[in-house]
Amino acid sequence: MVKPFVFQVAGYQNRGKTTFIKKLMENLRELNVDVAVLKHHGHGGKPDIAKLKDSHNHFHAGAVASLVEGDGTMELLGNFSAGASITELIHLLELFHPDVILIEGYKQEDFPKVILIKEESDLLLLEGLVNVKAAVAWPKCLERTRKQASVPVFPLDSNQFFDWFLEQILGWHNARSIAINKIVEEDQ
């Protein structure tokens, strides 16, 4: 199995990360790229979980995990008593065999990332985070971001980032394919 391309979308709260990921996912799905998403609940505390069906009732009654599956679709609720590392969560998503895993949040992690710049105060992230590969800026911050950034900067209201992102995925997958082909040839 080829490991998925892992990429983060980072930025402060209320900067449009979820909307940005949704648009990126829609574009990738049009190209038959399978995407999984890992979202960090950065609002403090546990995420809200609706009490809708039996699986939720099992979970709220004390099950350490509750999984419901039907017709190939599943929903999993779980409590990691010691917390789960981002690596463990990525491994869980890898079970679905995605081509790409998009991570929303987890700013301090060392995966390649794009930063969303909506306010001038967001520019601090360009220097404060590791493995920043690109920035996407709102119109009012675009020129200032371009002057300050040492990475490619794209306007929010264009497809330029998506085109750049596809090149990153294709380059990554091509490099992996070359390495895999070399291993196969050596085994023969």
Where are these regions (language model features)?
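Phosphate-binding/switch loop-helix module in NTP-utilizing enzymes
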Residues: 78-108
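N-terminal phosphate/diphosphate-binding loop that engages ATP/GTP or pyrophosphate donors
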Residues: 25-81
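Short, hydrophobic beta-strand segments that form beta-sheet elements in well-ordered domains
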Residues: 101-103, 113-118, 132-140
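C-terminal accessory "lid"/substrate-recognition subdomains
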Residues: 95-99, 149-188
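Short loop/helix-cap segments at secondary-structure boundaries that form the rim of catalytic
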Residues: 108-111, 124-130, 142-150
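Short glycine-rich anion-binding loops that position phosphate/pyrophosphate groups of nucleotides
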Residues: 43, 73, 106-108, 119-121
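Walker A (P-loop) phosphate-binding motif
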Residues: 1-43
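Charged helix-capping and loop-helix junction motifs
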Residues: 51-53, 83-87, 120-121
